[in-house]
Amino acid sequence: MADITEYLERSMQNCSLIDRRSSMGDGFGMSDEHIPISDRFLELSSHFSVPSHLEQCLDLKTGEIYYRSWNSGMRVKEDPRKSMSRGNYADQSSGESSGTVFSSEEVSSYYESEESSSESSPSSRKYHKEEQDEDVLVVAGCKACLMYFMVPKLFKDCPKCATQLLHFDQLHSTSP
């Protein structure tokens, strides 16, 4: 197992998203000197979320990151998170505001009030729980094809062979 891991690590070290030269060998005996340091790493800024109407994509041919709008399909190369933060600072310094800014207390109180109003009746609570279960992905294993899958919580059959899946979240879930 250690040999396989070591082999994969060496192979991945020789990969470059921007350099079009590819190594068909196993990666042994190659030096990293031919790959510039800037080509080895790609900053995704994944610790900040992308606005909900955009999708962050990677062009595998060029190695460039671009953003695609789900509404219009337009591609933008500039990171919208950076332009939004610059725009907000500019608006605040000029005294203008492009939208309503809520404090974290206001947002949390809004969500708490939404939860309490939607959970007022038992039928709405049951519907709300079923709706939440549809959106949750869980790990499930198939005993027949010996594979693991990420499937919606309410999904019971293996997507490959249609036998019953073994859900690994059942230890933590409460059943009625």
UniProtKB/Swiss-Prot annotation:
Q: Which InterPro entries match?
A: WWC/KIBRA_Hippo_Reg
User: Per the record's keyword annotation, is ATP-binding included, yes or no?
Assistant: yes
Q: Where is the WW domain?
A: 48-82
Q: Where is the composition biased (Low complexity)?
A: 93-106
Role this protein plays: May negatively regulate the cuticle development by interacting with the HD-ZIP IV transcription factor HDG1.
Gene encoding this chain?
CFL2
This protein is called Protein CURLY FLAG LEAF 2
Q: What keywords is this UniProt entry annotated with?
A: ATP-binding, Helicase, Hydrolase, Nucleotide-binding
Instruction: List the disulfide bonds in this chain.
Output: none
State the residue spans of region: Disordered: 77-106, 111-130
